[in-house]
UniProtKB/Swiss-Prot annotation:
Organism name: Colwellia psychrerythraea (strain 34H / ATCC BAA-681) (Vibrio psychroerythus)
CDD domains xref list: DnaJ
The protein's name: Co-chaperone protein HscB homolog
Protein task: Co-chaperone involved in the maturation of iron-sulfur cluster-containing proteins. Seems to help targeting proteins to be folded toward HscA.
Domain J: 2-74
Keyword Chaperone: yes
Assembly description: Interacts with HscA and stimulates its ATPase activity.
Keyword Ubl conjugation: no
GO cellular component: iron-sulfur cluster transfer complex
Pfam families: DnaJ (PF00226), HSCB_C (PF07743)
GO terms, biological process: [2Fe-2S] cluster assembly; protein complex oligomerization; protein folding
């Protein structure tokens, strides 16, 4: 099952989330298990399976990074696992710099300003890299798909680092 076809939307990194949501609700109404309460056990099981598939498809397409990964997998791009090391040494250095920047927040004289700075840097870099990946996905050739795969992994790093920033913020201001 192709998720984009399921929701009758064009294969693209940019998705109209309102259209996606509307299609999702329409599909769920047709297969919702409650509609099959008086059906046979097999029909109920099929309804539950279809509903779960629609939920999975919706969750994948509404999340930009999951959507990008789905598109790349559909294009048979080999997705390295999370443990696979980056070949991009400049990005490895940037990872270390960002982690140091995050660690420095704890020891800053102005924690609020330091946190805002980290959040601003992460947001800016995430948006820039996301735009690059968006272009690469739209180009849809072997080189651009491979580059998009690398950038997707980088964006996942930024996403995880943002979670760490949120946790740090919670720990600093919960006291």
């Amino acid at each position: 099952m192709n998720y984009f076809q399921l929701f009758n939307i064009e294969v693209s990194f940019d998705v109209d989330l309102q259209q996606l949501s509307s299609s999702y609700q329409t599909l769920q109404k047709t297969v919702h298990p409650d509609k099959f309460a008086h059906a046979s056990e097999q029909e109920q099981r099929i309804a539950v399976q279809k509903s779960a598939q629609i939920n999975d498809a919706y969750q994948t397409l509404k999340n930009p990074l999951q959507r990008a990964e789905y598109i790349l997998v559909q294009r048979s791009v080999e997705m390295p696992n999370e443990q696979h090391s980056f070949q991009d040494t400049s990005f490895l250095m940037r990872q270390m710099e960002l982690r140091e920047m995050l660690e420095d927040v704890r020891h800053s004289g102005d924690v609020d300003a330091a946190l805002l700075e980290v959040q601003s840097v992460l947001s800016t870099e995430y948006l820039q890299l996301s735009q690059v990946m968006r272009t690469q996905i739209s180009e849809n050739n072997a080189a651009s798909n491979s580059a998009a795969c690398d950038n997707l992994r980088k964006l996942k790093f930024y996403q995880k680092l943002n979670i760490e920033v949120d946790r740090l913020e919670d720990s600093l201001f919960d006291d």
